[in-house]
């Protein structure tokens, strides 16, 4: 062995290529162990170890062979098949006498061995079965592990991809941050430079401002000096003129006296009586005395112009209006010169030369003194006392401060010749200047503010100072100051009831409470003296005004709102009655009437303003006559500034203050005879009750001196005083077209203030309808500017010029557009006005409408068509056809064309701006959008500064302009054809428009691809989100997959019009050119569907998540036998059909032929029919036949209509074990039988419309794979929400409305109705009545019409929900009491208790699940309540159902039910359940006639028992609850009714207390409805519900309170008022006895339940 091993060593060590050489060398060399190296020794050792191991192996092999030979030799003749021989051999071998036998009995040993082998075999088989099951589990786990590994790999790959993307994004962000930081540094540097420049400019500006202010001060001082000198010159000039006038008047008097003397001489010569000749000198003497006293006889008019110029309203024409002042000295009066001076205004604001300076009409103050014809000497004594009784001449005027201004006063003259004096037009101040404007004459303003301070006001040091009096000759002038002020205070106090200050004008601080002279604005410094004045004091010059209107446009401070002007110099010694007080007037020269004006501070603007607050003009009669209410009964508003005047801010007019009262002026431009002394008999006086002393004032046809306002006719028209206006119009000779200086006629004033009745009166009186004012504005212009559309309509009807243009070119249409008066615009357009008239600045009405941002006006101008035959559009047409442009394509404007031309839209004004320029620059996006809808708009037109619309636009308008030429192509999602319709897919829409893509000229194909993908992703996330989130909120979520599993990968194809396209594909043309060339009107995205073996389109159509659909398909492919079950309407049929289609196309793609076989199961579907179906479809084949390769898909629908176990019992085993080894024998019709089996290529799917299986059907459960579609679990739970949300998004064209939108609220309500209904039905234990979401998929979504949804809900309630609930409750209530045939009888003839339960359940479901949470207002909801059957059940729930904004559990108001408490009584009230109203309660049975017979029979029984108290106990059998299930239903209803109004009723804890019952002779308990309610307080949580075991009875409230047990009226517990639990109520007893009797404690606190039919409840007797 060692030699062999040594010889083998070289073979192991040498290489194959030199094996021969190595052997030769080994043979030559001598083997020497000592010469071996270390590696060779190791090799030798390993070889020797191998030899030893080989020797051991040989030894073992030899031993084994020896053992086998030994056994064969000894036991070879025996066979293991016969162990008995072996045992016999051993027995015989040891059968010697000495040796003991090996076994006593071989047979028993063999039997024991066999028993042991059986046990072992059983154990091994059990272990084998366990091993097989473990192997199966292992294989399943391996498959799951592989799937998880694949998913893990995918996620890892996606993670790496996302990391790569994120790295790129981070790098880009870092780069961009660096760029931005550099730009920030540059911008900061630029900002510093700009700020430095700004500081330099500010310094320069400050220096210039200082120089300018110094220059202003110097100019003001110089102007003040000039004014002082001019005042002195004016005064001297006027004194000389007055002196000349007095001399002329004196000469005239002398001539008159000479003529009279000549007449007297002639009379004496004729020998006439001496008495007349003696009386005439006396009259003359008296008159002369009066002349000396007054000095105002013989009216001679002179012109005095104002001294200070003012910037007028229109600079192109300026009028010089003289100031007229009467001057007439008395003959031979020593004070003639003084009187001449006293007749002149000493104020610079009142008189100035009218030669070299231009005076505005607003700067003039008119003074006129008409003559009053006396009737007797006593009349003269009233106004001027005789010589003997004349007080000091200087008493007629108080001592005035140098800045004070008493009113000019004149006493009427005597001679009638003075009535021929010409009328003074200077009294007619324009209406616009009737108020005190901020920009009035500074000299008048200075005088006014100087005059506002009281003479007795304390100065700065607190000392009471008085201004020095005027320098008069009389020494008693100071003493008469008190009398003068007392007279003024008296007039003010007497008129306080008519002229109280406005609400917004508090009295000036420091003013005396009596309202003396200091509280009134001054007229001007007009120190007009009477005959007793020696010389005229010029007074101090007015203070230097802070800013002249000619130098600055800053308005002066506003004047006080209350101004009273008292024009008086002396008054008679009579009392003036005012404010129910008689106040004595001191002796003063008060004229016949005092004018008190309550003025408003009228704003000025460049356009017509709304009328100001009303002002009151009153005339006070000093002779004790009361002022009639006619003058103040219909007081309107004074007109504001003239309409349409585009004045600068500095062009306000000055104050007009007339200082004269017209008594009986004969200055009448129309007819001098209209003011005769007998005018007091006129119609006006007769109607108003005025005294004759006031009649001449109102009846004078001359200018009415009412604070410079127009005539009385104009005042009545402006104030809307129809009564006064009609009386004035009845006067003869009245000029109704008379215009004030601004040209304002009475018609103009009435139209401007919107007094339609006055306009109608004036037009009927043939007033000039087109009379224009000085600025060219007609009454139609004024009415259109102010928005008085009724006046506009009336003026148009009287042929007013609708195209009249004012001086500035403003037409009525322009003014209406400028002020946004759309009704006036419509009337003018329908009258045919010209839209294209332009102003002098080149502005059109479109410019005006756009300038104010008035969208409605612009729509009218562009789209309102003129009627063909003058017929105005109806209101509905105009509303729908004009103002719905914002609705987009659905509005009429989206389809109709504008009526204006492109040239008109593109017209540019003087600066070159079009209407689009104005809208874009002001940010009026809506106006710009309307303009852009006109096809002819030129957005590239440039103004005179070479700017386009885009250049001047704001950011929003720029975005609009950029998208102007963009193509808006709707993007639609299509799911292909949904077929057939009977699979519950009627409500599925094949196409949904998700948004509109804006395709611009510069849009690239990459941008277009991204836009399409982003739009789809946003849409999928919008419809699958949990709330109403906007697209902006969802774009923050970067996940590409939505909750339902759809993404851009779900797209099968995209078509641009009719051209197919895929994401990322590019064409030669740009998207914009491509769409135009191919006339692509829409982009359609087709989702992958069952035809491609995918379920994306099914997911989108049904809103079932894609993963769940894929899981269902996997179950069908893996298990072959799958049944889908759930409540009716859970889309089982649709799901099964779509899965079958997808499976079919998948198998066909794999190369197999496939067929779908559908069978509808009904009650008559037999097992034989099912067998024939299986055999005919080659799903069940004979054992002898080879298996087919064709795939068969069997669909069995409506399996709930048949007994599942009876139908499928014989097919269960072969369906589970599909092979020839487990066949099943079926008998044919001819008596022959044959073995069949199901092959592996057969798939069986079924649908059951049941929530759960019952009875024998449970035996089938283990043989199928079941998919349960629960209403409270996915996919059904969120399906309806996603479906309705997609409906809403489709209605809003891809936009998600906000949660507060009514559409969102009504959709949320429909969703909550479905959930609450199923929750309530689950709690009632009626799963067969549960509803799937299919019935609610047809919920209409109509924006703005929530009533449509409520009506749809009522139809669903009446047609679907009510019959199902009724059937379910009846079946449950009668299932235990009656079995078999009697159960059907019970359904046909429900008992009284069953009817009660059904009615109560319907009513509770309606109020708690349906109407609860409806967003309609309560009043509107009550109108729809009658549409719901079963809602008339007397729950009397008083609550607001509009609680959708509350969270769950927060709305407890709906349970607040009101009933009066009831007391126990001995009489029993009969139940009203015997007379149910089936038509209103919605109980639908097949045998209504039988039910009606029973109802009538029970009613007759009830009537016969009504008066018999003893027999009422027998009613309990008819009215008792028939079964425990019926009682359980009652408990559930009671618990639901007493719950806290949680929307999810399943969350409400059980709160049931004992329902008390009373025994009646061992009979069944009477089920009561009303529990005695004692007036006790209630807590919200302690509610005493009604249980089925014990009832508490209550009597009718009509019966008297007696001892004993009370009866009940109705059946179901419904709380009517909340009371606390009774103290004796314990927890529910475990006893099930129905006859336990419990006393009612009078102190118990219990609920009052009422379910009787009548709505009202009778009050209890007290």
UniProtKB/Swiss-Prot annotation:
<feature type="region of interest" description="Disordered">
    <location>
        <begin position="1"/>
        <end position="23"/>
    </location>
</feature>
<dbReference type="GO" id="GO:0015629">
    <property type="term" value="C:actin cytoskeleton"/>
</dbReference>
<protein>
    <recommendedName>
        <fullName>Cortactin-binding protein 2</fullName>
    </recommendedName>
</protein>
<feature type="region of interest" description="Disordered">
    <location>
        <begin position="1446"/>
        <end position="1473"/>
    </location>
</feature>
<feature type="compositionally biased region" description="Polar residues">
    <location>
        <begin position="582"/>
        <end position="592"/>
    </location>
</feature>
<comment type="function">
    <text>Regulates the dendritic spine distribution of CTTN/cortactin in hippocampal neurons, and thus controls dendritic spinogenesis and dendritic spine maintenance. Associates with the striatin-interacting phosphatase and kinase (STRIPAK) core complex to regulate dendritic spine distribution of the STRIPAK complex in hippocampal neurons.</text>
</comment>
<feature type="repeat" description="ANK 6">
    <location>
        <begin position="911"/>
        <end position="941"/>
    </location>
</feature>
<dbReference type="GO" id="GO:0051721">
    <property type="term" value="F:protein phosphatase 2A binding"/>
</dbReference>
<feature type="region of interest" description="Disordered">
    <location>
        <begin position="453"/>
        <end position="477"/>
    </location>
</feature>
<feature type="compositionally biased region" description="Acidic residues">
    <location>
        <begin position="874"/>
        <end position="891"/>
    </location>
</feature>
<dbReference type="InterPro" id="IPR036770">
    <property type="entry name" value="Ankyrin_rpt-contain_sf"/>
</dbReference>
<feature type="region of interest" description="Disordered">
    <location>
        <begin position="365"/>
        <end position="439"/>
    </location>
</feature>
<feature type="repeat" description="ANK 4">
    <location>
        <begin position="808"/>
        <end position="837"/>
    </location>
</feature>
<feature type="repeat" description="ANK 2">
    <location>
        <begin position="742"/>
        <end position="771"/>
    </location>
</feature>
<feature type="modified residue" description="Asymmetric dimethylarginine">
    <location>
        <position position="497"/>
    </location>
</feature>
<feature type="region of interest" description="Disordered">
    <location>
        <begin position="871"/>
        <end position="897"/>
    </location>
</feature>
<feature type="coiled-coil region">
    <location>
        <begin position="118"/>
        <end position="275"/>
    </location>
</feature>
<feature type="region of interest" description="Disordered">
    <location>
        <begin position="498"/>
        <end position="615"/>
    </location>
</feature>
<keyword id="KW-0175">Coiled coil</keyword>
<keyword id="KW-0963">Cytoplasm</keyword>
<dbReference type="Pfam" id="PF25408">
    <property type="entry name" value="AAA_lid_NAV1"/>
</dbReference>
<feature type="compositionally biased region" description="Polar residues">
    <location>
        <begin position="516"/>
        <end position="529"/>
    </location>
</feature>
<feature type="compositionally biased region" description="Basic and acidic residues">
    <location>
        <begin position="1644"/>
        <end position="1662"/>
    </location>
</feature>
<feature type="modified residue" description="Phosphoserine">
    <location>
        <position position="1523"/>
    </location>
</feature>
<keyword id="KW-0966">Cell projection</keyword>
<dbReference type="InterPro" id="IPR002110">
    <property type="entry name" value="Ankyrin_rpt"/>
</dbReference>
<dbReference type="InterPro" id="IPR019131">
    <property type="entry name" value="Cortactin-binding_p2_N"/>
</dbReference>
<comment type="subunit">
    <text>Interacts with CTTN/cortactin SH3 domain. Interacts with STRN, STRN4/zinedin and MOB4/phocein; this interactions mediate the association with the STRIPAK core complex and may regulate dendritic spine distribution of the STRIPAK complex in hippocampal neurons. Activation of glutamate receptors weakens the interaction with STRN and STRN4.</text>
</comment>
<dbReference type="Pfam" id="PF09727">
    <property type="entry name" value="CortBP2"/>
</dbReference>
<feature type="repeat" description="ANK 1">
    <location>
        <begin position="708"/>
        <end position="738"/>
    </location>
</feature>
<feature type="compositionally biased region" description="Polar residues">
    <location>
        <begin position="404"/>
        <end position="421"/>
    </location>
</feature>
<dbReference type="GO" id="GO:0043197">
    <property type="term" value="C:dendritic spine"/>
</dbReference>
<feature type="repeat" description="ANK 3">
    <location>
        <begin position="775"/>
        <end position="804"/>
    </location>
</feature>
<keyword id="KW-0677">Repeat</keyword>
<feature type="compositionally biased region" description="Low complexity">
    <location>
        <begin position="1623"/>
        <end position="1637"/>
    </location>
</feature>
<feature type="region of interest" description="Disordered">
    <location>
        <begin position="1614"/>
        <end position="1662"/>
    </location>
</feature>
<keyword id="KW-0040">ANK repeat</keyword>
<keyword id="KW-0770">Synapse</keyword>
<dbReference type="Pfam" id="PF12796">
    <property type="entry name" value="Ank_2"/>
</dbReference>
<feature type="compositionally biased region" description="Low complexity">
    <location>
        <begin position="385"/>
        <end position="395"/>
    </location>
</feature>
<dbReference type="InterPro" id="IPR050719">
    <property type="entry name" value="Cortactin-Actin_Reg"/>
</dbReference>
<keyword id="KW-0597">Phosphoprotein</keyword>
């Amino acid at each position: 062995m060692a030699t062999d091993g040594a010889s083998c060593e070289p073979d192991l060590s040498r290489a194959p290529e030199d094996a021969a050489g190595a052997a030769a060398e080994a043979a030559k060399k001598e083997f020497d162990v000592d010469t071996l190296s270390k590696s060779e020794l190791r090799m030798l050792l390993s070889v020797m170890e191998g030899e030893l191991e080989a020797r051991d192996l040989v030894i073992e092999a030899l031993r084994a062979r020896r053992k086998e030979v030994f056994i064969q030799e000894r036991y070879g003749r025996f066979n293991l098949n016969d162990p008995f021989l072996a045992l016999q051999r051993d027995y015989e071998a040891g059968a010697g006498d000495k040796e003991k036998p090996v076994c006593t009995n071989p047979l028993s040993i063999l039997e024991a061995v066999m028993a042991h082998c059986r046990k072992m075999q059983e154990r091994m088989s059990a272990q084998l079965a366990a091993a097989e099951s473990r192997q199966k589990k292992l294989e399943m786990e391996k498959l799951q592990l592989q799937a998880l590994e694949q998913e893990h790999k995918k996620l890892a790959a996606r993670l790496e991809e996302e990391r790569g993307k994120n790295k790129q994004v981070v790098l880009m962000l870092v780069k961009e941050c660096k760029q931005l930081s550099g730009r920030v540094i540059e911008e900061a540097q630029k900002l510093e430079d700009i700020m430095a420049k700004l500081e330099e400019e500010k310094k320069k500006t400050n220096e210039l401002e200082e120089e300018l202010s110094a220059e202003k001060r110097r100019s003001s001082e110089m102007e003040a000096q000039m004014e002082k000198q001019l005042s002195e010159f004016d005064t001297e000039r006027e004194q000389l003129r007055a002196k000349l006038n007095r001399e002329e008047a004196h000469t005239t008097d002398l001539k008159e006296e000479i003529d009279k003397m000549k007449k007297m001489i002639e009379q004496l010569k004729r020998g006439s009586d001496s008495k007349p000749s003696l009386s005439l000198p006396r009259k003359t003497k008296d008159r002369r005395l009066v002349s000396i006293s007054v000095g105002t006889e013989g009216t001679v008019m002179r012109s005095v112009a104002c001294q200070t110029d003012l910037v007028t309203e229109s600079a192109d024409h300026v009028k010089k209006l003289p100031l007229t002042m009467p001057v007439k000295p008395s003959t031979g009066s020593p004070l003639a010169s003084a009187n001449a001076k006293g007749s002149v205004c000493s104020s610079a604001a009142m008189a100035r030369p009218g030669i070299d300076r231009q005076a505005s009409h607003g700067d003039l103050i008119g003074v006129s003194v008409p003559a009053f014809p006396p009737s007797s000497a006593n009349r003269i004594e009233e106004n001027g006392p005789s010589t003997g009784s004349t007080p000091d001449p200087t008493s007629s005027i108080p001592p005035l401060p140098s800045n004070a201004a008493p009113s000019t006063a004149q006493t009427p003259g005597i001679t009638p010749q003075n009535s021929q004096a010409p009328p003074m037009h200077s009294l007619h101040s324009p209406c616009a200047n009737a108020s005190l404007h901020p920009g009035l004459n500074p000299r008048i303003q200075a005088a006014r503010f100087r005059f506002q301070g009281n003479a007795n006001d304390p100065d700065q040091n607190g000392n009471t100072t008085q201004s020095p009096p005027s320098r008069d000759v009389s020494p008693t002038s100071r003493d008469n100051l008190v009398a003068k002020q007392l007279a003024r205070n008296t007039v003010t106090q007497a008129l306080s009831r008519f002229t109280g200050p406005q609400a917004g004008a508090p009295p000036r601080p420091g003013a005396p409470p009596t309202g003396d002279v200091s509280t009134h604005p001054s007229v001007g410094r007009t120190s007009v003296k009477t005959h007793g004045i020696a010389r005229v004091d010029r007074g101090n010059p007015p203070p230097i005004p802070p800013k002249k209107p000619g130098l600055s446009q800053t308005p002066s401070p506003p004047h006080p709102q209350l101004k009273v002007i008292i024009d008086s110099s002396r008054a008679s010694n009579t009392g003036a009655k005012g404010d129910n007080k008689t106040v004595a007037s001191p002796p003063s020269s008060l004229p016949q009437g005092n004018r008190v004006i309550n003025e408003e501070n009228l704003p000025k603007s460049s356009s017509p303003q709304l009328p100001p607050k009303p002002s009151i003009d009153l005339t006070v009669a000093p002779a004790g006559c009361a002022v009639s209410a006619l003058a103040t009964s219909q007081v309107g508003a004074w007109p504001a500034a003239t309409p349409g005047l585009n004045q600068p801010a500095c062009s306000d007019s000055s104050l007009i203050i007339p200082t004269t009262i017209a008594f009986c002026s004969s200055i009448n431009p129309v007819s001098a005879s209209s003011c005769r002394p007998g005018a007091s008999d006129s119609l006006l006086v007769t109607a108003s009750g005025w005294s004759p002393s006031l009649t001449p004032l109102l009846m004078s046809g001359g200018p009415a001196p009412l604070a410079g306002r127009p005539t009385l006719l104009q005042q009545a028209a402006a104030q809307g005083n129809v009564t006064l206006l009609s009386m004035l119009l009845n006067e003869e000779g009245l000029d109704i077209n008379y215009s004030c200086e601004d040209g304002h006629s009475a018609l103009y004033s009435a139209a401007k203030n919107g007094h339609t009745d006055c306009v109608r009166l004036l037009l009927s009186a043939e007033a000039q309808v087109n009379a224009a004012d000085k600025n060219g504005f007609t009454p139609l212009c004024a009415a259109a500017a102010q928005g008085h559309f009724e006046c506009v309509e009336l003026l148009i009807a009287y042929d007013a010029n609708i195209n009249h243009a004012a001086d500035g070119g403003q037409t009525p249409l322009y003014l209406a557009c400028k002020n946004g008066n759309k009704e006036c615009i419509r009337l003018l357009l329908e009258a045919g006005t010209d839209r294209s008239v332009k102003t002098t600045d080149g502005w059109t009405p479109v410019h005006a409408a756009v300038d104010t941002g008035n969208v409605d006006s612009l729509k009218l101008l562009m789209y309102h068509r003129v009627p063909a035959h003058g017929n105005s559009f109806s209101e509905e047409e105009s509303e729908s056809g004009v103002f719905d442009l914002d609705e987009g394509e659905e509005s009429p404007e989206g389809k109709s064309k504008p009526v204006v031309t492109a040239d008109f839209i593109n017209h540019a004004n003087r600066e070159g701006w079009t209407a689009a320029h104005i809208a874009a620059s002001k940010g009026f996006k809506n106006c710009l959008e309307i303009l852009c809808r006109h096809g002819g708009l030129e957005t590239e037109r440039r103004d005179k500064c070479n700017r386009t619309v885009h250049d001047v636009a704001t950011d929003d308008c720029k975005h609009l302009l950029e998208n102007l030429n963009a193509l808006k192509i709707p993007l639609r999602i299509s799911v292909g054809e949904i077929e057939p319709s009977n699979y519950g897919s009627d409500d599925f829409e094949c196409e949904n428009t998700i948004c509109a893509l804006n395709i611009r000229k510069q849009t690239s194909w990459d941008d277009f691809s991204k836009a399409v993908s982003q739009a789809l992703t946003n849409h999928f996330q919008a419809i699958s989100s949990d709330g109403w989130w906007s697209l902006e909120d969802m774009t923050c979520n970067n996940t590409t997959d939505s909750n339902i599993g759809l993404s851009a990968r779900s797209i099968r194809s995209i078509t641009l019009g009719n051209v197919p396209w895929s994401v990322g594909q590019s064409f030669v043309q740009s998207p914009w050119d491509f769409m135009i060339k191919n006339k692509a009107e829409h982009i359609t995205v087709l989702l992958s569907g069952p035809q491609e073996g995918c379920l994306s389109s099914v997911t989108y159509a049904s809103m079932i998540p894609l993963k769940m659909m894929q899981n269902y398909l996997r179950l069908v492919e893996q298990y072959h036998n799958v049944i889908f079950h759930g409540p009716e309407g859970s889309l089982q049929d649709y799901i099964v059909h779509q899965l079958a289609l997808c499976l079919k196309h998948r198998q066909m793609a794999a190369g197999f032929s496939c067929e779908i076989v559908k069978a509808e199961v009904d009650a008559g579907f037999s097992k034989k029919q099912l067998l024939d179906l299986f055999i005919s479809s080659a799903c069940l084949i004979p054992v002898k036949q080879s298996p087919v390769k064709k795939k068969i898909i069997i669909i069995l629908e409506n399996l709930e209509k048949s007994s599942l176990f009876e139908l499928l019992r014989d097919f269960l085993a072969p369906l589970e074990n599909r092979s020839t080894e487990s066949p099943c024998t079926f008998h044919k019709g001819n008596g022959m039988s044959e073995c069949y089996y199901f092959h592996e290529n057969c798939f069986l799917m079924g649908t059951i419309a049941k929530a759960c299986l019952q009875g024998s059907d449970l035996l089938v459960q283990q043989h199928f794979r079941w998919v349960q579609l629960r209403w409270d679990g996915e996919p059904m739970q969120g399906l309806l929400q996603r479906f309705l949300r997609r409906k809403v998004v489709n209605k809003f064209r891809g936009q998600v409305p906000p949660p507060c939108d009514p559409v969102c609220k009504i959709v949320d309500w429909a969703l909550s109705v479905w959930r609450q209904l199923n929750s309530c039905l689950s709690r009632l234990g009626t799963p067969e009545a549960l509803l799937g979401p299919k019935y609610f998929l047809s919920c209409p979504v109509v924006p703005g019409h929530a009533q449509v949804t409520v009506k749809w809900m009522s139809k669903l309630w009446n047609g679907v929900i009510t019959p199902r609930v009724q059937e379910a409750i009846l079946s449950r209530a009668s299932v235990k009491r009656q079995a078999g045939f009697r159960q059907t009888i019970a359904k046909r003839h429900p008992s009284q208790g069953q009817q009660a339960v059904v009615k109560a359940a319907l009513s509770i479901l309606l109020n708690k699940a349906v109407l609860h949470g409806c967003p309609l207002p309560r009043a509107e909801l009550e109108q729809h309540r009658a549409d719901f059957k079963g809602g008339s059940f007397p729950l009397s729930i008083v609550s607001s159902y509009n609680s959708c904004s509350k969270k769950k559990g927060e709305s407890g108001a709906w349970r607040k039910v009101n009933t009066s408490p009831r007391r126990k009584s001995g009489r029993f009230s009969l139940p009203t359940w015997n007379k149910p109203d089936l038509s209103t309660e919605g109980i639908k049975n097949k045998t209504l006639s039988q039910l009606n017979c029973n109802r009538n029979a029970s009613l007759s029984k009830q009537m016969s028992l009504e008066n018999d108290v003893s027999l009422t106990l027998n009613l309990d059998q008819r009215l008792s609850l028939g079964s425990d299930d019926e009682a359980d239903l009652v408990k559930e209803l009671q618990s639901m009714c007493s719950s806290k109004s949680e929307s999810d009723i399943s969350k409400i804890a059980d709160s049931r207390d004992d329902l008390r019952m009373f025994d009646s002779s061992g009979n069944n308990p009477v089920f009561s409805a009303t529990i005695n309610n004692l007036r006790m307080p209630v807590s919200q949580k302690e509610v005493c519900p009604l249980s089925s075991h014990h009832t508490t009875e209550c009597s009718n409230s009509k019966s008297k309170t007696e001892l004993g047990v009370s009866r009940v009226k109705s059946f179901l517990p419904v709380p009517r008022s909340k009371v606390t639990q009774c103290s004796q109520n314990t927890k529910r007893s475990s006893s099930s006895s129905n006859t336990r009797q419990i006393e009612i404690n009078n102190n118990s606190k219990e609920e009052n339940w009422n379910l009787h039919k009548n709505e009202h409840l009778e009050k209890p007797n007290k």
